């Protein structure tokens, strides 16, 4: 009777059970050393002693995907948005030097569609595999009074660990350090309220619009998953004393690069030192945005920036290339006079 009453209230308990069965195989492939317990336990568990750290510091992060979700819903493509969710969380804690250990997801929806939920969690599991993190728990909440039947929201939470003496904080970056940029895949997961306004409101384009500068339909470009930098950057951290790491997210270069600096330092960014992806030129044109506005909002083709001593530049680039990364020397750290971010040179690409 209780289930029948719950169903009358709009909550499909049976669909929830189907989701659990469907996602088991995806969760299983994220298993890693230290992960404990089984899917369905009240709490996810992790054995910290398995890491053999002398002074472990736990680093946590939580994030969502923002209005990029609206594009996934409109396009009915749900198998990569979970990668975005994982990326936004694990890249953030990587900036402190932490190795992601585990991840939990939260999905809220108006109506539980087991096939759709499986696709979302598949993406989350794909992201966890890329990050080396175990998917140890999550929640799917059906709330018909809060969401439309096709709507959902997705958020995640991750915890990582790092030796206390290897923790990266803003005080380590020094004047004269070199900035090394690692490419993004595209827009990643920030600025989509503006992106959607530019393309679909102001210019009235369709999801499948073909734009000459892009090699795929517009929606395919906009749904490219956020890159996960964990494995190549962890390899760099084994070899090099990295002074600072920035995950270039909302606020672009202007807001994020200063986050690894003390107040007396600034960064000089050499425009033209890396190829700007075509999607950014397209947005600048269609949105009639200035060059500075673009760098204040978007990653402009660089998703993560490392600050290292000049003596370590060559080795850093070598390790990144060995791990399949293109990487660019994009600037340097200098004494601050006015602005924390100074752009020099011209654009490229």
From Swiss-Prot:
The keyword Nucleotide-binding applies. It is an enzyme of class 6 (ligase). Belongs to the AIR synthase family. It catalyses: 2-formamido-N(1)-(5-O-phospho-beta-D-ribosyl)acetamidine + ATP = 5-amino-1-(5-phospho-beta-D-ribosyl)imidazole + ADP + phosphate + H(+). This is Phosphoribosylformylglycinamidine cyclo-ligase. It comes from the Bacteria. One of its GO terms (cellular component) is cytosol. Its EC number is 6.3.3.1. One of its GO terms (molecular function) is ATP binding. It is found in: Cytoplasm. InterPro entries: PurM-like_C_dom, PurM-like_C_sf, PurM-like_N, PurM-like_N_sf, PurM_cligase. SUPFAM superfamilies: PurM C-terminal domain-like (SSF56042), PurM N-terminal domain-like (SSF55326).
């Amino acid at each position: 009777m209780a289930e029948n009453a719950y169903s009358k209230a709009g909550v499909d308990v049976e669909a929830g059970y189907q989701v659990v069965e469907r996602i088991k195989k995806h969760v299983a492939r994220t298993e890693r050393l230290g992960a404990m317990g089984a899917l369905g336990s009240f709490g996810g568990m992790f054995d910290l002693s398995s890491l053999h750290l002398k002074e472990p510091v736990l680093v946590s992060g939580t994030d969502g995907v923002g209005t990029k979700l609206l594009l996934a819903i409109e396009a009915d493509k749900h198998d990569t948005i979970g990668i975005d969710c994982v990326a936004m969380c694990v890249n953030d804690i990587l900036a402190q030097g932490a190795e992601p250990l585990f991840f939990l997801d939260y999905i809220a929806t108006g109506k539980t569609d087991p096939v759709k939920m499986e696709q979302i969690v598949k993406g989350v599991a794909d992201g966890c595999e890329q990050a080396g993190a175990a998917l140890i728990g999550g929640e799917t909440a059906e709330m018909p009074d809060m969401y439309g039947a096709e709507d959902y929201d997705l958020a995640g939470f991750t915890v990582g660990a790092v030796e206390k003496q290897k923790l990266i904080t803003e005080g380590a970056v020094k004047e004269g350090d070199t900035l090394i940029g690692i490419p993004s895949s595209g827009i990643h997961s920030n600025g989509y309220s503006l992106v959607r306004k530019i393309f679909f409101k102001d210019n009235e384009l369709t999801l499948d619009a073909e734009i000459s500068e892009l090699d795929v339909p517009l929606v395919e470009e906009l749904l490219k998953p956020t890159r996960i930098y964990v494995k190549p950057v962890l390899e760099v951290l084994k070899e090099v004393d990295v002074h600072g790491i920035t995950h270039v997210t909302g606020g672009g270069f202007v807001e994020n690069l200063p986050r690894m600096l003390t107040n007396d330092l600034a960064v000089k960014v050499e425009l033209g030192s890396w190829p700007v992806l075509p999607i950014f030129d397209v947005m600048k044109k269609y949105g009639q945005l200035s060059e500075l506005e673009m760098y204040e909002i978007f990653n402009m083709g660089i998703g993560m920036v490392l600050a290292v001593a000049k003596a370590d530049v060559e080795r850093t680039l070598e390790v990144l290339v060995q791990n399949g990364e293109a990487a660019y020397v994009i600037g340097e750290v200098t004494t601050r006079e006015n602005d924390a971010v100074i752009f020099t040179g011209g654009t490229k690409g």
